[in-house]
Amino acid sequence: MNVLILAALVQVQATAVREVSLGKVDRVVSQDFTQIRGLRELPDGRVLLSDRLDKGVVVVDFGTNSVRVIGRTGRGPAEYKLPTTLTALPGDSTLLSDEGNSRIAIIGPDLKIHRSLNVMLPGGSMAMGARSIDTQGRFYLQIPAWMSNPQSPNANDTIPIVRFDAKARKVDTLLRLKGMSWLPPGPRYGFGWVVFAPQDVWTVTADGRIAVVRSGDYHVEWYEPSGRVVRGAPVRFERIPVTMEERLAYVREFLDNSMISGRGEEGSMSPIPAEMKDEKRVREMATRNTFAEMKPAFTDGALIQGPDGTLWVERSIRLGETPLWDVFDGSGKHVARVRLPAKRQLGGVGAHHLYVIATDEDGVQHLERYSR
């Protein structure tokens, strides 16, 4: 039975949130992709998409089943290397994270790259990755533990979210959240943090509202530009044990999505080569690293914003289960739960459609569109 998600959002029960599944695929783009990392629906219904390893940044047109490349791979103006997230900015512009060049880029409404820049905080020596830019040109970013507490970066897992005014050289701390659970300094094989330990996640809307999903009792908070904070009710969740198979799956995914320095052109960042991802190394990393006993309520993946003001949060699931997403409204209320088909991942949310990434047995990805 084809159950529309929009109907579920309207017909929410006061006592329980309904779980709905996607209906039939509306459209599929025939173009192959390798590693889709960012997606944003444009006002005219086309989709801006970033393929981190292969196609670069492209405009996808479902109506004509076509793909057009924006910019090109490189280190110069209007170029990028390993493009990742795409975030809506005021005025129909888009913020692109250029991971390979350690910078960000601004894509205008004309779908051209107008500017690439590094965000450097006062007194800092390393470029930072901004989550968003508001109408006044101020950057929103997360300060890592090694920078916010350089004397004892592993002492606690609380990190600040700041707003940086580059013109005034002013940094304002807006809130704090629970970050990764870092391990004490010392030699180790692999991760320096406790894998699957609960941590808060956040995002910023184009109008400057900050959404935070708190990991303690799993609830959503909205921080308004005026300073007003709106908190939703806690959401019940299942405690899922972390098995050895879960550990192995995590390590494989981590290596597939990680970078290594000195292997790319001119010593730049590049994907980890296959010889460093053999089964023996994967199992050794899964055995020797520190994992939490239970999975958190939700993953540490990026939050997805809907143009209707909804916030989409990916739930933790058991290995082998299909992806599950919770939907919250602008007040932090839990309004829906959406189950995806197998081998699918939610890429983006549009006004009338959901965009889903389908991955086949060979790791090839295709972009699917479903009606909301």
Regions inferred by a protein language model and the residue ranges of each:
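Sec-dependent signal peptide recognition
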Residues: 1-7
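Eukaryotic scaffold repeat domains enriched in small/polar residues
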Residues: 8-372
